[in-house]
Amino acid sequence: MDVKRVKQILSSSSRIDVTYEGVPVWIESCDEQSGVAQVYDVSNPGESVHVHVNALEEK
């Protein structure tokens, strides 16, 4: 995935399924300059991680 698509997903009112290493995640935010997104596991929303947007996949 790229930064442009992550930003589109963040601004969308629709639910868009995204995974990180095969795990369903919600995207919390995205830093356009670094290409890093803050995501959290849908099943464990208490823990977020920062990942490169290239590691995210839209399902």
UniProtKB/Swiss-Prot annotation:
Work out whether the entry's keyword set contains Membrane: no
Its predominant location is other
Record keywords: Sporulation
**Annotated GO biological process:** asexual sporulation; sporulation resulting in formation of a cellular spore
Stimuli inducing this protein: Expressed only in the forespore compartment of sporulating cells.
Q: Which GO terms describe its cellular component?
A: endospore-forming forespore
* Subcellular localization, as worded in the UniProt entry: Spore core
Pfam (any one): SspH
Which family, according to the similarity comment? Belongs to the SspH family.
UniProt-recorded name of the protein: Small, acid-soluble spore protein H 1
Species per Swiss-Prot/TrEMBL record: Bacillus anthracis
What taxonomic ancestry is recorded?
A: Bacteria, Bacillati, Bacillota, Bacilli, Bacillales
